[in-house]
Amino acid sequence: MISSDVIRGYNDTMILFLLQHNDSYGYELSKQIKLLSEEKYVIKETTLYSAFTRLEKNGYISSYYGEETNGKRRTYYHLTPEGLNYYHDKCREWNITKEVIDKFITVSN
């Protein structure tokens, strides 16, 4: 399991990555993160919804209500063009970060 402290700065990146493909809602996005990380990272609900609020406030995503199911309407999130640009910036930042950290990480058998 990955510590949430280690990955905190990249929750937004993971969400934006997933929203490139389809609009989605919170529970589905959390399941996709768990699945793609091979269950090494499980995003907490509070972390996820804090990220949605931050991303929407910054214009990186927009939200809308979907059809009502079981008495409740889901909130769907959509990636904006600004969000796609931000995602690409974060990917470049990650590659630089990884390059630097790799210089300090050694793996011994």
Question: Which residue ranges define each predicted feature?
Answer:
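Basic amphipathic alpha-helical segments that dock to polyanions
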Residues: L48-Y49, L55
